[in-house]
């Protein structure tokens, strides 16, 4: 480890505790509040939102709520009471929200789990009573449900978690009431445990107030661990937990005809492609603490498509997981991160988007498929866009003191078809080629608490059937990762954590060479003293690790210091997401928050951060520092700003396997703000920019406006535009012995002017809490123009000489292509890098939950795509051309039915 790296960490470790001393001693923590639950008895409880059954009077009330915001620690401005009953099969919660101005209660309609500007009442149950995991059930005054799962003591949450439960509300002149029925089968608990953790909360939208029964203040450490206790749950057994949700769907795809005029008929083209499907989801309680969730032939047609993007860098784009099976209950599979505030681009050890990914083999047509046709031969192909998931299963819950999670999925082999024709249109050959092999994906996660220490372990495994002779050279046969992590609470505010993980990938020599040369590693770099491609290897192994010290609570000061490494051979990309290996980095963050409202502000805060990183050869890759600040005004507007700077360092990725280059010093900034979120019309804006010492620069703005013209309708418009100039934009690279100064590898760059425009539009129309229509449209245009072609002529250059400065020529043809003749006698080459990419994405989703757990989806999706080898046309013209670009429509009807 370089001396400067060690020095920074040593200074950070000594400085952070001193800076983090609170301005006053923390208050002494009293014992938890307690609430006695009452037995519901044999008389039926009518779920009507009135709490008029006599049994409700036998339950003790929880009252005396305390504000979390806007005045932390102050008594709630309006009285609230909560009571709990229990029966053999359910928990009942009654909440009464008194309001002296009941006519001002905010009660808009929206979809379940939507972020509404609304009053809200909720109960949170820590049924494990582990002070780390809890289930939230909430409702607004007109019956819009909200449920979510908290884990890691509330530091993380799963908003996609949807349970099967009921709630009814009522309103009167004195306020409103909510009556919940939560089946025991939807919770996880240990039979015989008569005490759970519990929290009750209420939001009053017009005043921006949130109050809770067991006080949770902004300066507190944790969330679930601060709950009160629900006692008296006598005789809770293990209810039957079996849920079966079959589905049937029908999808019709109308695709454009892109054949050349007069060409042979495409045997795979159909104006409308019909595809019926059926499958089933299953949830089975193996015990009161352990659940099996499975899906067979899953369908995710109702999930919104990924936004269009243009990737001009070598890094893979990270795509958000949206598929319900892989999002719900993912808390158990959270691992691979130490507790810190510093963002250090660590490998993500589990990335479920790998399951069911796009097929990886592109060139599946044999090279001689159209030999008989000569130059006039035409080849038509048809390949799937996604890999079919045959089935997947999760087991999650607890076995004694151990929290356990197991995930397994199997994907089908996928084949592409091809047909070749001669110049007369007569078929020459017809065949198919494997584009994705049969694969299995497995994840195991376990953790347990030992006093103030949490110890965990995890493993991932990918196995592929590579018996097809075309595949062993394309991808590994087997890939695994093993991880061990530990977290120790030194005090209520201080947490030390760390992890170590190892990876092992095996496959053919060609596959392992591909991994060595891939962008995260680039073993082929000619001036890397510690790396080199080994073409005889059939495996690749490596390690990654991280340690961190975090101050996670306190009246004002928070912070963390952390250090991490990833060895050159570590690879988690078969079931994870990793943008680079060969990395050592560290950083420190010091945070100050003021959460007590005074005068013109409700809260304000800021942080300072610094970090640096090297590779294993000791090259300083980055060194940066910055400041961030935010303020919440008394009128409920918000503002934030940041300013960052980085020093001149070394870039070992810019040339994509070529020589090292210097990375210029630069600065970046952003300024943002938002208006009062309680209003019918609310907005936000975000301006960002950057510049560096060699002349690269960028500026962008994103704005948003959301209007609620009626209580059940919300319209949002979110345009964004950016423009920039890049002095060193990668174009291409190839071997050329004449490029002696760069070890026979010629890497071509250019100056590039780039700009992008997008505008997302959303309409949410809610007819009832269970019937809604969502509309979405997003046009997208990205342009790039290239000039002043240049090449590095030696390692560690900051400014690359242009082709003309190096004695060569660059001649542009009428079609926009540029032919470059190097001045060192190398072979000429031609490039056509200018581009305009257009896309229009739209969808409409009608969702009707016609009974709890059962839904009907009617979906329409539209996609238009266009490309031009010209980056000069204005945005307005390109938006007009979108109307003429090839169009694909997808229509889907999906019906699910819940048995349980």
Identify the meaning behind each predicted range.
Residues 217-238, 416-479, 487-490, 551-554, ...:
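Outer-membrane beta-barrel transmembrane domain signature of Gram-negative proteins
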Residues 6-15:
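Bacterial N-terminal signal peptides
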Residues 20-449, 456-457, 466, 885:
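Structural preference for beta-rich elements and adjacent junctions enriched in aromatics
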Residues 89-91, 133, 176, 192-196, ...:
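Outer-envelope beta-barrel architecture signal
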